[in-house]
Amino acid sequence: THYVDARTALKNSDIYSIVYQLSADLADGKLKATAPRAQGILNNPTKTSNAHAFWQSMYAQLLLGGECFAYRWRNDNGLDLYWEYLRPSQVQPFLLEDGSGLIYNVDFDEPEIGPMQAVPQGNMIHIRLMSRNGGKTGISPLSALSDELQIKDQSNKLTLSALARSIMAPGVLKIQHG
């Protein structure tokens, strides 16, 4: 089976449209927590964008890649200050040797932060959509679209080829009835 990456999938207008609509609809939903502090971070998770944009990014990545990540920046007392969205390419999860949980290696874009090794799972938001390995990682729904996208790609190539070989008349043919 051929792997479909998110960049390729988003060039397909149908996939782009459904991912955009679903992620926007999910981001419109209200996440509820019982503790006021937890509700505060859910309502305002990041310093770099509004809550809707943050959650739409998280849900879009979840729909495209099967999982999404955010780092939990905390104060000295362990209380969440804000969350930072992370691309999957910035995060590598590892199972602890005793199997009791996960740790993460995280590469931040900011040079002053740099890479962090062995980040405990309590410092990460890691949402997974289905799994084949007991919940360690998620499965991309795009893997199910591999054949369909290959067929569509070949159909598009055939159509473009046929159009390129079609006869282009340089003028207009006039017929006089007589």
Regions found by a protein language model. Give the residues of each.
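Structured, contiguous alpha/beta core segments that scaffold functional sites
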Residues: 1-178
